[in-house]
Amino acid sequence: MDEQKQKIKKPHKKMSNKLFTGIWGSLLALLMVGIITLNVVLLKYSSLITRSLGHQTVATVNLDTSGDSDYFKSAFATEADLLAHETEISRQIEAEGIVLVKNDQNALPLQKGAKISIFGQASTQFRYGGGGSGAIDETNVQSLKEAFTQEGFDVNETLWTMYQDSGLKIPKEVKPDDFSAEVEKSFAAYGDVAIFVFSRPAHEATDLAEKEVSLSKDEQALLTYINAHFDRVIVLLNIANAVELGWLNEYEHIQGALWVGYPGQQGMISIPRAVNGTVNPSGRLVDTYAYSAESSAAFENFGYGRVENGYNSVGAKNTYVVYGEGIYVGYRYYETRYEDTVLGQGNADSRKGASDNKAWNYGKEVLYPFGYGLSYTTFEYSNFKLTEE
């Protein structure tokens, strides 16, 4: 009987599929983590491990060096020659890009030796380049005062020092009431011309705020002050984007204006050369300058769209705008609407998009059209003949 009991074996309890899967899944996950970690470590220290094991990863091969291995030959004997050439190219680009925007009563060019007072916080905070890939090393750039002095102008040092020490940033300006008696006294000795520098720092991913596309209240007050103390005012437009410039015609003594853009590392000297006529400005505007930024199709379309539960890597609070202008951006919009208005097509002459909320009128919307630019040269056309074919 005892032998029979021994022969009767108790059945083994089988492991459930769920438990089996859980155990092996965990083991495989740990194994995978270990493999990935080991792979990362081995890749990071592959060179050290290879050298420790005595393996070679580089083989030295004796090649025939009798031939010419200089595939890209430089046209310059030394780096100094190359730098001198690039400097000249930079200055040429700036010189040929400067646009003469306004020149009433032939206010420009100025005579060398003119005694000038340079106004505006931007005079000592001049923009040389944009941001991102458009930024430059400003360590050794030439200042506006240095450039004008080099070109034979006598610059008001007292006024220049005031702006250097003001501690303000564009578009804030030293208020007229804060001009010291010493500064105001200096105008008599440097009163041939006042130069006002207008600047804005917009660049890719950093568009201007609405209040920055026109004169700030500080700048308006400063221009009123300048006009009260000087009979001739010249404006330098240190900008790379289209802003509202109607104010150039609102101050009696603003007689000339030059769009100078951003001069880069070496282009600054070309600005006073354009002012004194060494360079004849031949540039043309590459944007349409409207009286009001609100008249553009983009402004009509722009809005503060939000994406619920969205994410924006640059921290723009999940904002978005649907691009709806198509090709009608800049001059394509203004010139097309002008043609449609003249031809009476569609509702182009409606007040929609008009800055004065009246019938749309090209002359009231566009201050400087695409491709605009004056010259010191006087042109004359005569002896026209028309032949009917």
Which sequence ranges carry the predicted segments?
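C-terminal non-catalytic regions of proteins with extracellular/luminal or membrane-system context
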Residues: 1-389
